[in-house]
Amino acid sequence: MTLDALQQRLGYRFSKPELLQQALTHRSHSAQHNERLEFLGDSVLNCAVADMLFGMFGKLDEGDLSRVRANLVKQQALYEIAQMLQLSDALRLGEGELKSGGFRRPSILADALEAIVGAVFLDAGFDAARALIRKLYIPILEQVDPRTLGKDAKTLLQEYLQGHKIALPQYNVIATHGAAHSQQFEVECIVPKLEVRVFGTGASRRAAEQAAAKLALDEVQKLVPQLLKRSRAERTGKTRKQPVPPDPQLSLRLKE
């Protein structure tokens, strides 16, 4: 992807395009890499996301706001935004990193996204960086449920199962499709105790696992109440008093 095409995706045009080029440069490519920009972008991102959360969720306290922000700026969340922007097509990697599939690595893509935020901050200041972050995050924030504090599907599924003392799910890659630079992964998620088996697809194993976990969570939340209801009914049946058989000796005495 050209720098011009990426700027169109970002909705921001750099006055100093070399900043964007540096933001896309991994340390394996050259000494003029993106790690300092990543450091800067991380701080700008945290501040801008905090500002948005403060305005959107007036009833959340400081602790809950911090937890929502942590889930929104963690590597997986940044990686998914980077995938949406197709940053893997614009990265500048060294030959070894390129051959090992570095353009698909979540850590590299997440770091590049933070570096882009840092580059925008240097290019035009905080307001421009905040506008970019808002553009990228508003679709995500509109789907955030304050009750779950922005946790991803795998975390929610794990916590739900643990809360009901059910063994954790199993994730298995069952297929990969497409060329190396545009692979699609297919993953199954199994919850043996509930006989749940669902499938998810994504541009990475993690993304496919998240998709499968979301489907599994929907199924599990339907099945667990039914399981609990049956369990309560069985316990009630076992504890209900059985009728006491008549005493034969007592019957004889009464007849006398």
Curated annotation (Swiss-Prot):
Q: Which residues carry out catalysis?
A: D42, E114
Domain DRBM spans what residues?
Answer: 152-222
What Gene Ontology cellular-component terms does the record carry?
cytoplasm
Residues annotated as signal peptide: none
Q: Which coenzymes or cofactors are required?
A: Mg(2+)
Q: Which UniProt keywords apply?
A: Cytoplasm, Endonuclease, Hydrolase, Magnesium, Metal-binding, mRNA processing, Nuclease, RNA-binding, rRNA processing, rRNA-binding, tRNA processing
Which GO biological process categories is it annotated with? mRNA processing; regulation of gene expression; rRNA processing; tRNA processing
Record-annotated RNase III domain positions:
3-125
Question: What is one Pfam family matched by this protein?
Answer: dsrm
Q: Which residues bind Mg(2+)?
A: E38, D111, E114
The enzyme's E.C. designation:
3.1.26.3
- What segment(s) does the record annotate as region Disordered? 229-256
Q: Gene3D superfamilies recorded for this chain? A: 3.30.160.20, Ribonuclease III domain (1.10.1520.10)
Task: Note the subunit structure.
Answer: Homodimer.
Describe the function of this protein.
Answer: Digests double-stranded RNA. Involved in the processing of primary rRNA transcript to yield the immediate precursors to the large and small rRNAs (23S and 16S). Processes some mRNAs, and tRNAs when they are encoded in the rRNA operon. Processes pre-crRNA and tracrRNA of type II CRISPR loci if present in the organism.
Protein name, UniProt field: Ribonuclease 3
Q: What is the lineage of its organism?
A: Bacteria, Pseudomonadati, Pseudomonadota, Betaproteobacteria, Burkholderiales
Gene giving rise to this polypeptide: rnc
